[in-house]
Amino acid sequence: MLDMKFVRENPDIVKENIKKKFQDYKLPLVNEVLMEDKELRQTQQHADDLRANRKKISKEIGKLMGQGKKEEAEDIKQQMAEIAHELTALEEKEIKLRESVTEKMMQIPNIIDDSVPIGKDDSENVELERFGEPVVPDFEIPYHTEIMERLSGIDLDAARRVAGNGFYYLMGDIARLHSAILNYARDFMIDKKGFTFVIPPYMIRSSVVDGVMSFAEMEGMMYKIEGEDLYLIGTSEHSMIGKFKDTILEEKDLPYTYTSYSPCFRKEKGAHGIEERGVYRIHQFEKQEMIVVCKPEDSMEWFKKLYMNTVEFFRTLDIPVRTLECCSGDLADLKCKSVDVEAWSPRQKKYFEVGSCSNLTDAQARRLKIRVKGENGEKYYAHTLNNTCVAPPRMLIAFLENNLQEDGSILIPEALQPYMGGKKKIG
């Protein structure tokens, strides 16, 4: 959410930013917000004037009563009753206006960074850099679920009978490989990157949902617990950032660098939907995430550090990757800048998304009231960032395809062998 003062002083910049994101249907919101904000401030001023007048009259009544002029005091008390009635109406109007302004402000997208390429959707994202040499073996690579089925590592039919499409049973060495990747990611982030490991709540309240994402994202992603003010998280970023809700942080304690493990639950109601037989887009998966809460001047430096952590992690497992700068139309409303990390698929002979890093500047912090007290005592909003270290279902696809041997076995990179009981290959 933007600063109202910024919108008030820079309406043209806000409108131009909306156009850059190809959301012209939101342009009327800016003028509506400005009009309602003006009316709100006028209402507040009128109410303040009435309160001041009420205070003045109250003193006058006290003075008259002290002088024994009860009749005169009673006459003036009628003015107090009229003021109280008018003040109640103004306060009700103020509440409605404030709610309306907030609702509209939450629909206006964050200001994107000047470096973000302009484009309508992910087809116009821009490649930044490649790491590792993509290899296509001279033998045919089966679909990832077929590789796992040959190794007795997955049962999609049983999962479909139990829960429907978008779920799976992982078994044996594949299940162990899944856990090994997560455990290695945890230790990589703790031991090599110095992040604090946290296991967060897997459900959050609606007030946190409103703070971490837009309503449109929430509708397409999150499962609500019936009869409760609780939602299953779509990523641990939600509960990790929510940890700082309604807090004032000490500047000397920044940055907070957390890495978290959690299961994730998603409706996947968007254009892509879920796969009938596959683990790329599913309803339930696990993930190792990282978040940073920092000073505004440090957020862009942390932004590159975060996505390079993911690049480094994948390269330790010998998986070629590339980074893509997300264009303006591909950015969610709260994001200022975002980079996707994609892994090489030898079967498809192309890269596919395995993680995303985002700098949300102060958009989430304003919604969640995450402030920082500086050394001079002044308070300002923190910047928040998030990044995927690894989501094993997608990582499994990249891992299996890039480490598959012609005989159907899977090589285990040295970094993972301690987490696989010393095994150097499976199958």
What spans do the regions from the language model cover?
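N-terminal alpha-helical targeting/anchoring segments
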Residues: M1-P134, E149, G153
